[in-house]
Amino acid sequence: DNLDVPASLWQILHQLKASGYKVGTLPESQEALLDMMQERGVNLPRDVGELEKMSGLVQLMSAEDYSNWFAQLPASVRQEMEQGPFGLLHQQLSSAIAVGKPHLAKDALDHTLEEMHHLLEGVDHKGRERALALLAKLESCYLAAIQSTDALVCMAQAPSIIDALQSTGIEGLGGWGAAPGKVMTYKGELLLPGLIFGNIFVGPQPPRGWEINEELLHANLAFPPTHQYLAFYHYLRNRFNADALVHLGRHSTYEFLPRRSVGLSEDDYSRIVAGDLPGIYPYIVDGVGEGIQAKRRGLAVMVDHLTPPLASTPLYDELLQLRQLIESFEASHGSGS
């Protein structure tokens, strides 16, 4: 929040160098560092031309490398990554109903549908209304299965509704497909943007999705991250062999990934991402609540920074004209015209 990341990063790198850390050759200025980041440290949408250009500038991970690592993850994680939140939900409900635990099925249903309702209600997509209608239909179907003695019939109807939901074209509802997916891939390799300065890797945290507003995904606890997201941290931990992770400034997203809030296990995404690596997290001092989340789920040690001094400035030029137009529109709308 309001942290000048390039300037802060510049200062941190030079302090590390002064302390004896191997940081290689640093750029001459903050502006030069920012230019390097914009060239080699940016995640891109599915633009083949731009991905081709970047593929020769950044770290790459082969599909084989990632797939071999991915295959070692818990089955429920692999299923959710490949089939999306509804694929996992169907498996959870089927298992709970089969062993006579309807309350567990209801808990799983409530959790997933709450998160998916929030996402779909906010998404800007032509298939939004149809997706919401299908979600309501799926909820009715699953509730009937949980409450009915003839659950098999109800559960048999759910997959066709899930297929219809996934066919709306809203990103991620059907998962990210078989590893390594399609996000940030070029010719079968995953692209991992970033810069290497000696023993320091500096890179942007991958987004949790592309087409959906990042704010809707930031703390969504039912929507799995992309394959590239997991590959990024797999690279840092197991290929770059980092000794610690530094997430510079609020907000990261790894502490808000799906699954448990406390008592994390091997199938929790935050644990998959952070593993046993210490986390160092420069964090604005007024973000105590979310900072605790990062400590609990991300093994983070918080390093507080003060809120920066800010000043309000008056609007000018086109911004002033825009405000006047907005005020005129609001006034006319309020008068019923």
Label each residue range with its predicted role:
Residues 1-337:
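Ligand/cofactor-recognition surfaces for anionic moieties
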